[in-house]
């Protein structure tokens, strides 16, 4: 899931062990409830897909791209799908297609890697709004995907350095 994150952020997650330990310790009870709620809603999406008569297969299938292992959410009617629960703000990005311009969690890159491993050109997100229960489908065409192998090579190259990669943003706030 790190494939969509900036190289600098990934570099620090591997090279700053004190920060990693601190982040792990900062999860609270409510954080774990939010994670659980997200997993439950994603299971509801799978259930609803099956109940509506769709064929859901290859759930949590292990995939390998450029020696990196991942697990896809599944296939719905032979289309690669990632099930997501989202806040109303994030849900709107999937519904309107703005996710292709503003993807802070790297969802497109992750789905691109799964698509590359499956050798498919089309995929999509089935997303539920955690607040309203609204559901949308956001198709992802291969022209919107990244080359996952090249991206992994870029990450590896940056991790080999003892110096963090350059910032992908201005050091001076706007």
Label every PLM stretch briefly.
Residues 1-80, 86-105:
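Metal-dependent nuclease catalytic cores that hydrolyze phosphodiester bonds in DNA/RNA
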Residues 83-84, 126:
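Beta-strand residues in well-ordered beta-sheet regions across diverse protein folds
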Residues 101-103, 113, 117-174:
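Metal-dependent nuclease catalytic regions and adjoining charged, substrate-binding loops involved
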């Amino acid at each position: 899931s790190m494939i969509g994150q900036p190289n600098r952020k990934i570099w620090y997650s591997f090279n700053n062990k004190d920060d990693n330990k601190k982040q792990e310790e900062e999860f609270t009870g409510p954080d774990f409830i939010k994670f659980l709620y997200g997993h439950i809603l994603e299971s509801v999406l799978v259930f609803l897909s099956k109940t509506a008569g769709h064929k859901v297969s290859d759930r949590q299938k292990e995939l390998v791209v450029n020696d990196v292992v991942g697990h896809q959410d599944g296939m719905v009617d032979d289309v690669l799908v990632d099930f997501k629960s989202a806040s109303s703000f994030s849900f709107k990005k999937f519904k309107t297609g703005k996710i292709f311009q503003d993807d802070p969690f790297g969802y497109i890159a992750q789905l691109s890697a799964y698509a590359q491993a499956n050798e498919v050109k089309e995929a999509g997100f089935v997303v539920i709004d955690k607040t309203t229960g609204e559901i949308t489908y956001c198709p992802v065409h291969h022209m919107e995907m990244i080359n996952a192998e090249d991206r992994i090579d870029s990450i590896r190259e940056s991790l080999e350095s003892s110096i963090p990669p350059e910032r992908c943003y201005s050091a001076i706030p706007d």
